[in-house]
Amino acid sequence: MVPKINYSTNILSYHISDLRYRGRICIFGLMKAFSVEQLIDGIQSGDKRLLGKAITLIESKKTEHRELAEKLLKEILPFTGNSVRIGITGVPGAGKSTFIENFGRLLLKTGKKVAVLAIDPSSSLHKGSILGDKTRMEELSREENAFIRPSPSSGFLGGVANTTFETMLLCEAAGYDTILIETVGVGQSEVLVSDITDVFLFLKIIGGGDELQGIKRGIMEMVDIIFINKVEGDNQQKAKNTKLELLRALHFLPSKEKNWKKSSSSGHRPKFFAP
C-alpha cells in the first residue's frame, strides 16, 4: 500500500501507513515565496540563502517561475561581468573537487570572494543527480567568503547545466569576483564551458591514455592551461614525461588565442603546471 502524505498550509506532515515504505519517503520543505525585489536586495547584501533561492528560481522549469527569473536577471545584469570566470575540467578521478577546494582556499587568503558552480552528471533514465560535490569541498563550504552550488546537468551537453551562465551572473551580482565552474568531466562534449569562461583549465592525470588520442577528443583544442595533477612520489618523472609528450602532440593543433593581458613576455599557451 502506498503511504499517504498529508499537506497543510504551515507544516508538511505525513502519515506512513506501511512501514515498508519508510526508506522511500522524501519530505520536501515548503519554500517561502520571495519577491524579485527581495531576492535582489538579498543577493546584493551577500545573503547566501537568498542567492540559493534565486538560483533555484532560474533552474525551475515552471512557466510562472521562468517569467520571474527573466525579470530577476534583467534587474541584476548591470551588476555583472566583474569577475574572473574559470572553467575546470578533467576525466572522472582527475581530482577536480580536491583541486578546486585547495585553489579556492588559496584565493580566499588573497582577499577574493569565490563561488564554485559544480555540475554533476544526471541519470539518463531518471534525470536525478547525487549532487555530492559540496560534501567533497567541506572545508571550503564553511568559509564565509565562499559559495558552493552543485547543480545537475539534466542531460545538457557541454559540461555545464543549461542555467550555468545565468547562475554565474547571479554570483557576480552577489559580489563574487572569482567564479570556478567544475564541469561534469566526461569528454569532448565539455567544450561549451570555454565559451562562457575567461580561462579554461584541463586537469590531466598521469597514465590517462595516448596523448594524440586525447587530442582527437577535441577538448585539448579549447583549453588554456593544462595542469598535470597527482604528482607525488614515483610519479614525478612520469609527470615530466607526460608534459613532453603533450608538448609534442600539441604541435598538431592550431593556436588558440584569447585577449589576455600578459604579466610576462615569455611563455606559450597552453601552459603546463608540473614539476
Predicted region positions:
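Nucleotide-state-sensitive switch-loop elements of NTP-binding domains
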Residues: 35-83, 94, 103-189, 196-211
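Well-ordered beta-strand positions
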Residues: 199, 224-225, 248, 271
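Canonical P-loop GTPase G-domain recognition
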Residues: 232-275
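Hydrophobic anchor at the beta1->P-loop junction of P-loop NTPases
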Residues: 86-88
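Short hydrophobic targeting helices and cationic amphipathic motifs
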Residues: 7-8, 12-15, 19-22, 28
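P-loop (Walker A) phosphate-binding loop of NTP-binding proteins
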Residues: 91
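Conserved Switch II/interswitch segment of TRAFAC-class P-loop GTPases
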Residues: 197-213, 224, 231-240
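Hydrophobic positions on the alpha1 helix immediately C-terminal to the Walker A/P-loop
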Residues: 99
